[in-house]
Curated annotation (Swiss-Prot):
Protein's UniProt name: Inactive protein tyrosine kinase pTKL
Taxonomic classification: Eukaryota, Sar, Alveolata, Apicomplexa, Aconoidasida
Organism, scientific name: Plasmodium falciparum (isolate 3D7)
Positions of ATP binding: 836-844, 864
Compositional bias annotation for Low complexity: 543-597
Domain commentary: The protein kinase domain is predicted to be catalytically inactive. There is a second N-terminal lobe-like kinase domain at residues 830-1095 that contains functional ATP binding sites.
Keyword ATP-binding found: yes
Length: 1501
């Protein structure tokens, strides 16, 4: 038989309208003999026929891979029917008479998994007896006596031992020459000679007995020799050994020799034990001396201490040597980067370099946490937070009182305006000398007076003060703009009182809008910054200075009163503990204590012209936090206890922290001035980045400039993916060449969540914590998907030279190169015409995968997703440790593992050529990423033409109303009842959907939808598009090239109706996009981006759950549950239904319902007739449930069987096969059986990618040398894993990855062991029914302030919208992942061996060797073997029938190896060691031929 159905057709191959037949025929071309029927709907049948009718035993395989085994008589079912589901160990038996079912029996035992072995070969005359072994019942198996079963077990054990042991193996001899000759005759043929296994077992037992006798003889000899004395020796007869008399001298000689031998052996053993004890002592010494290594002061470590730390981390010896040679101490650990590790230390592997950096990261996190714990006590800080909450309440009460006062003040201000006008005239005529004298008399330490213009920034150096020279004309313009203030010194209060008296006498200094106060802060002859403050009241200074103390923090001697500067408009309010600091070179702080809060400041009027962009303070931020903590002394801990973390980050070398609290009275006009800053003084003259927070939006601006943030509402820029976990707050820049990266932004997390401080000293020494990666550091870009073609028609074959010049179009049809080459992959692969799918079996197929392309620390990474809850952490850590120890050049490097319930992410290195399957067969495509700038560009484009669209919409709406009224009569109300939902709101939505659907149907052929411009655009071919290597494109190029293209497209589609819900450019409306876009980036502690960037959901296959009342409670969901955009993209035909009827691989929402009634042939019938049948099925199922519930009360339990009786159930259609699916479905619903469930994995929408598919010339066949190179790499890796006992390897063509130079590497080994540690019964955060109705767990999402979740099905991919209470939208990309409950039942594909297809298990390497043979055939023939569209066809053809591979274009020397690997008897398959020997000989032969050819070419012969 051939590889495909059409390329290599056998002789007896007949195609019909509904199925295809492969087998024997009569003279009348009727089915006669053994044959296979492959139905176009996905089912298959294997059995015997007589004159076109089914007779004898047969196996019917469903779409769900459930096997129905029974006997047929005249094309009718006779006797009992055995039902074997694929993913469960339960077996059902249906007994019936006269077309009436009498009873049903099921077995829960694992009898079918036990393999039966016979004396003769099972596969001799398989055509006649292929189904006897599989169709035997459990009752018949139990008839065998106990001795027969033991004999079979002995046979299986012997066969397994012969497969492993080379000495006893007669199939594979020692010599290679004998192996090649002998194996071709025996092991490479499926029909081998019979072996007398009884004789072999007898020989084996005799050998064992002989070995045991020899051992006993040796023991007796040793005892006799040692027991001999100087006296005469006597003869002893023990085990046929004769001892004669000997002399005393000989006896003494033998005694000495034996004693000396024992002494030598004892000494050797003692030395070995001493070495072991020394190693144990050293390990105990280092483990006990963990306390000697002070983690806090790791920067002061010597070389010895660094090596001691690495030894405790269980690092390889090569790393220790490289650290020792380069003399790396604790100071150098901070400056280590990837380049230094690879170039200087000599550790070239990128993965190993990252793991070293992860160890250093853990050490620094532990050091920071210890230092932080010493400085701050958490209990006292909780009291601080409580006080802060009380102040917030008091402030709210104070605001209401202020409003009443404002109204009274406004009346008084109008009366005083006349008086103030007179005072302003006097103030304008005042000279500058009064102010200059007032300053110069009272400030002694000013050495240089610097004057600046109004457009320059103000900055201070040591022993200098800065103030602005101003003219009288300039003062008039600036009086109402700024507040400025000076700090004042406590030691010079007397001199300031004189200034206050001088100002009180001169009333002309008063301004119309308020008073100016001047405060000078002097300390040890050094003047600090000058900050000007303007008060809001016209009262005297004594009244203003009284309410200075604010309840922000507990009173401390370091607190000094001051006024709030107006120069920093982004200053934080009093409720926030974070300071608003603006960068400027600062002067050295004062060591003298500040004044008491009761002492009032001295007011002094002053004039200033202060630019908006300028700001000055005495703050500067050090690049790292660790230097500050080391310099701080223990005496300052009492001052620091009650301060927030951001205040501590600005700590001084002298550790004298001074807080300036703002006054409690504010200006009436400006709301920005209501925010109180917390300002610190520091001693350094370097520039520092601005660090300003607000209550609504936390700004984090990293700019080495002197400008402060302009507005409170300005957009804050920060990275979405965090680079530190919740336990770590500060990590230096290990992974970049920069050394001054500032990450103090995340320190606030530890303070807000005080209990999350992870104080475990083992963190610094544990390597596994470096291997386990936080999920926040992972970025998911897109799933790795492979699409390939069915070679059913030679016209559509990729390898055909006629199709090489053609390119795929949007509808998967071939066109010339002039057309576009972009394809929307995630749409339905199959065309809307069902007849084409029936004839072609579906042109394109998709490989299911759980792999994603992502990024980790800026490096491209492949991420595999596993679903489940971890049962045993100890086993999982052991498995991960064993995987880490596996080191081979042909194994894919595992970067790490991250755990985020309910997912387990395994991170691999990314290979650019992807897997071998995609390199050979799949369609080549590129990914283009477009940034958010292009989104805004499209919104602006949309807004400009929105007016034109509205005009066309108004015209179209009038025309569509009449058209919809006509179509309403043709709508069947059964479509609504089909969803099992009785709410009136939902019914109305379904009717409206049918109206819109009929309107849009006519326009699909003429025009394209603009609804999905955001996710997919058909760009012209001339545009320069970056490949998968470059993850970003130049937006300017795309903008220039595609601007004209987009305008044309919008003009063509003017007549399309735009809805707020369906358009991708707007979630609610275009006006609200900018608000939702900005709000995503404003929130600092964003739960959706940081803590929950990965969500989880599960599809519930039961339709009964849709009618639950919990779905609609508390108005969590919209009334419009079935929006128009939910179904508009998935429905292409009237034959498709929302409840996921298995209809030619077209499913709504990609949900696979295992227990639906598949006996309905919806293809051949109309929609009305199908709906009637579905309603009948539901009624019938409800009746059977009632009967079964009655019968459950009368269960009869028999000794060793689970026996269940039922009432007689009448069969509606006795002659159509299978007639018992309704009855089986009723049992399955009552019994909780393990079954597949789909999980909706959702990740953040970081990029918009377009899938551009182009067929390249890489589909040509690989050369023989490249094939041999790939095969040798695979065999080397498999032999290494076989020695390490990592079974099963899970070898597949999709798990073989290729480099740029086509070096093969194996992945996914050991994942089956990890899955055994997982529990698939998960408490999902939300569930999705078949109607895409979402059910949320309230407790979890109410805490997160999530309002609702909605799925929007798009052409490109399904998006999940998550709404806040503020109606902010967060978009998530989604992917459907199958959750398998039993790992022993793998997915079926063309590489699965026949024993697994028949329902058995393989715990050894047998299945991997079978897959190896198919991979070799696949590479040599450049074709897919057993390329059938359905898994049931593969199960029937490969599992039960004897379809063989064709070896037309494959060399003869390799054919024998492939036949051995693909042998149906798994015990006759070779091991990987034997495969290596054969490949080495073949590789040498191939090289000799090439060398001979070269020599002959050079010689000219």
């Amino acid at each position: 038989m051939g590889n495909t159905l059409d390329s290599n057709k056998p002789k007896n191959f007949v195609t019909y309208a509904d199925y295809k037949y492969i087998g024997k025929l009569n003279n009348k071309n009727e089915h006669h003999g053994i044959g296979i029927i492959l139905y176009n709907s996905g089912e298959s049948f294997y059995g015997s026929f007589i004159n076109g009718k089914k007779e004898g035993k047969g196996i019917y395989i469903d779409k769900n891979l459930t096997r129905y085994i029974n006997t047929w008589v005249d094309n009718k079912v006779f006797g009992k029917v055995k039902v074997v589901p694929y993913n469960s160990n339960r077996v059902y038996y249906f007994y019936y008479k006269n077309y009436m079912i009498e009873k049903c029996i099921y077995f829960d035992n694992n009898i079918n998994n036990k393999e039966s072995h016979h004396k003769n070969n099972i596969y001799n005359n398989y055509d006649n007896n292929s189904y006897n072994n599989n169709s035997c019942d459990d009752e018949e198996k139990r008839k065998y006596p106990i001795g027969v079963t033991k004999f079979k077990e002995d046979l299986s054990n012997y066969i397994h031992s012969t497969h492993i042991m080379k000495k006893n193996n007669k199939l594979f001899n020692k010599n290679d020459n004998e192996y090649n000759i002998f194996s071709s005759s025996l092991s490479y043929s499926s029909d081998s000679e019979n072996i007398n296994l009884l004789d072999i077992l007898k020989k084996k037992k005799n050998k064992k007995n002989k070995k045991n006798k020899k051992k006993k003889n040796k023991k007796t000899k040793n005892t006799q020799i040692l027991s001999c004395t100087q006296h005469k020796m006597y003869e002893h007869n023990m085990n046929e050994s004769n001892f004669t008399k000997k002399d005393n001298v000989n006896c003494e000689h033998t005694d000495k020799m034996n004693i000396s031998l024992h002494e030598k052996n004892d000494k050797k053993n003692e030395k070995k034990n001493e070495k072991k004890n020394k190693k144990k002592k050293l390990f105990k010494y280092f483990s006990n001396n963990i306390e000697n290594l002070i983690i806090e002061n790791y920067q002061t470590w010597s070389l010895r201490e660094v090596i001691q730390w690495l030894m405790l981390c269980n690092v390889p010896v090569k790393w220790l040597i490289s650290f020792y040679k380069n003399n790396i101490t604790g100071d150098k650990l901070k400056y280590i980067n990837i380049n230094t590790i690879r170039n200087e230390l000599g550790i070239i592997a990128y993965g190993h370099a990252i793991k070293i950096l992860q160890l250093i990261k853990n050490l620094q996190v532990m050091a920071y946490n210890k230092k932080f714990n010493n400085l701050i006590q958490i209990e006292e800080y909780k009291n601080y937070i409580r006080q802060k909450e009380n102040t917030n309440k008091n402030i709210k009460k104070g605001k209401n009182i202020k409003k009443e006062k404002k109204k009274k003040k406004e009346k008084n201000i109008k009366k005083e305006k006349k008086k103030k006008k007179k005072e302003t005239k006097k103030f304008n005529n005042m000279d500058k000398k009064y102010i200059d004298l007032a300053i110069h008399k009272n400030v002694k330490n000013i050495q240089n007076d610097t004057f600046y213009n109004k457009h320059e920034n103000i900055y201070n150096c040591k022993n200098q003060t800065n103030f602005i020279y101003q003219n009288d004309s300039e003062i008039k313009k600036i009086m109402n703009k700024k507040k400025v203030s000076f700090e004042y010194d406590n030691n010079e209060e007397k001199k300031k009182k004189n200034i206050i008296k001088f100002i009180k006498n001169n009333k002309s200094l008063q301004n119309s809008n308020g008073e100016y106060y001047l405060i000078n802060h002097l300390s040890k002859g050094i003047c600090s910054d000058s900050i000007f403050y303007k008060s809001s009241q016209s009262k005297s200074s004594s009244q203003l200075s009284s309410p200075l103390s604010s309840p922000l923090s507990s009173p401390s001697p370091s607190s000094s009163p001051s006024s709030s500067p107006s120069s920093s408009p982004s200053s934080s309010p009093s409720s926030s503990p974070s300071p608003s600091s603006s960068p400027s070179p600062s002067s050295s702080p004062s060591s003298s204590p500040s004044s008491s809060p009761s002492s009032p400041p001295s007011p002094l009027s002053y004039k200033d012209n202060f630019p908006i962009s300028s700001s000055c303070s005495s703050l500067e931020r050090l690049p790292s936090y660790e230097k500050k903590l080391l310099s701080s002394s223990q005496s300052n801990i009492e001052h620091i206890k009650n301060l927030p973390l951001d205040v501590l980050s600005n700590n001084n070398s002298s550790a004298n922290i001074k807080i300036k609290k703002s006054k409690s009275k504010y200006n009436n006009d400006k709301k920005e001035q209501k925010k109180l800053p917390l300002i610190l003084n520091k001693s350094s003259s370097e520039f520092s980045p601005s660090h300003s927070y607000t209550s609504k939006s936390y700004h984090y601006n990293i700019k080495p400039s002197l400008q402060s943030s302009s507005n409170n509402s300005s957009d804050s820029s920060y990275s979405i993916s965090s680079t530190c976990s919740s336990s770590s707050s500060y990590v230096s820049s290990l992974y970049s060449n920069r050394s001054n990266d500032i990450l103090n932004f995340y320190r606030n997390k530890i303070i807000k969540y005080c209990n999350n401080i992870y104080m475990n000293t083992k963190l610094a020494y544990s390597y596994m914590n470096g291997f386990i990666i936080p999920h926040e550091d992972l970025i998911f870009i897109h799933p790795i998907e492979n699409y390939y073609m069915d070679n059913t028609n030679e016209k559509n074959n990729i390898n055909n030279p006629y199709t090489k010049e053609k390119i795929m179009n949007h509808n998967f049809s071939f066109n010339t190169k002039n057309n576009t080459s972009f394809i929307d992959i995630n749409t339905n692969i199959f065309s809307s015409n069902k007849q084409q799918n029936i004839n072609n079996f579906g042109k394109y197929k998709k490989m299911k995968s759980r792999m994603f392309k992502g990024k980790y620390m800026g490096k491209e990474v492949a991420i595999k997703i596993l679903v489940g809850k971890i049962k045993n952490f100890k086993k999982l850590h052991q498995i991960l440790y064993n995987l880490y120890n596996l080191r081979h050049s042909n194994l894919v490097l595992i970067m790490g593992v991250s755990i985020h319930y309910p997912f387990v992410f395994i991170i691999y290195e990314y290979m650019k050529n992807k897997c071998l399957f995609s390199y050979l067969h799949c369609i080549k495509y590129k990914h283009v990423y477009i940034s958010t700038f292009l989104q805004r560009y499209k919104t602006l484009l949309h807004i400009t033409q929105q007016e034109k669209i509205k005009k066309t919409n108004n015209i179209n709406n009038n025309n569509n109303i009449n058209h919809n009224n006509i179509n309403n009569n043709n709508i069947n109300h059964n479509n609504i009842n089909h969803n099992n939902i009785n709410n009136n709101n939902i019914n109305n939505n379904n009717i409206n959907y049918n109206k819109d659907y009929n309107n849009k149907k006519k326009k699909e052929d003429e025009q394209h939808n603009i609804e999905h411009q955001d996710t997919f655009i058909d760009l012209p071919e001339k545009s320069n598009i970056s490949s998968d290597d470059n993850n970003s494109t130049d937006i300017s190029q795309i903008q220039k090239e595609n601007f004209h293209f987009l305008n044309k497209k919008i003009e063509e589609n003017k007549n399309i109706i735009y809805d707020d819900h369906t358009s991708t450019l707007s979630d609610h409306s275009i006006h609200n996009i900018n608000k939702s876009y900005d709000n995503v980036y404003k929130n600092k502690m964003n739960i959706f981006h940081y803590q929950h960037n990965v969500l989880c959901g599960a599809y519930d296959n039961n339709d009964n759950n849709i009618n639950d009342n919990d779905i609609y409670c508390n108005n969590i969901y919209d009334n419009n549950i079935n929006d128009n955009h939910i179904y508009c993209n998935n429905i292409n035909d009237n034959h498709i239904y929302c409840n996921n009827i298995n209809d030619n691989h077209i499913y709504c929402n990609n949900i696979y319902d295992h227990h639906k009634n598949t006996s309905l042939n919806s293809k051949e019938q109309n929609t009305d007739h199908n709906i009637e049948q579905i309603n009948e099925c539901n009624k019938y199922a409800s009746e059977t449930k009632y009967n079964i519930k009655k019968s459950n009360l009368k269960n009869n339990i028999i000794s060793h069987k689970n026996f269940q009786k039922c009432n007689q159930i009448q069969m509606n259609q006795p002659y159509t096969f299978p007639p018992y699916q309704k009855e089986l479905s009723s049992y399955l619903k009552n019994e909780k059986i393990k079954r597949k469930r789909k999980v909706l994995f959702s990740y953040l929408k970081t990029h918009i990618h377009f899938n551009s598919q182009q067929i390249n010339d890489q589909h040509n066949r690989l050369s023989v040398q490249k094939i041999m190179k790939i095969i040798t790499d695979v065999t080397l890796a498999c032999t290494y894993l076989e020695k390490e006992k990592m079974s099963p390897i899970n070898l597949k063509p999709t798990n073989i990855l290729l480099d740029e130079s086509l070096n093969a590497k194996i992945s996914d080994f050991g994942i089956s062991k990890i899955e055994n540690c997982l529990d698939m019964n998960i408490d999902y955060s939300y569930k999705i029914s078949s109607n895409s109705v979402i059910k949320i767990n309230k407790k979890e999402y109410e805490q997160k302030k999530a309002k609702k979740i909605k799925i929007v099905n798009k052409n490109n991919n399904d998006l999940l919208y998550l709404y806040d209470h503020n109606n902010n939208v967060y978009k998530y990309n989604t992917q459907y992942i199958d959750v398998t409950y039993n790992n022993s039942y793998p997915s079926i594909f063309y590489w699965t061996p026949p024993e697994i297809l028949r329902g058995k298990k393989n715990k050894k390497f047998y299945s991997d060797i079978y897959a190896f043979g198919i991979i070799l055939w696949e590479m040599l023939s450049n074709d897919i073997p057993y390329n059938y569209p359905f898994a049931s066809h593969i199960m029937a053809v490969v599992g039960y029938a004897n379809e063989e591979l064709s070896f037309n274009n494959i060399p003869v020397s390799i054919q024998s190896l492939i036949k051995a690997c693909v042998n149906r008897n798994k015990y006759k398959r070779p091991t990987f060691e034997h495969i290596l020997k054969t490949i080495s000989t073949l590789y040498q032969k191939a090289n000799t031929k090439v060398e001979d050819a070269l020599i002959s070419f050079m010689d000219g012969t």
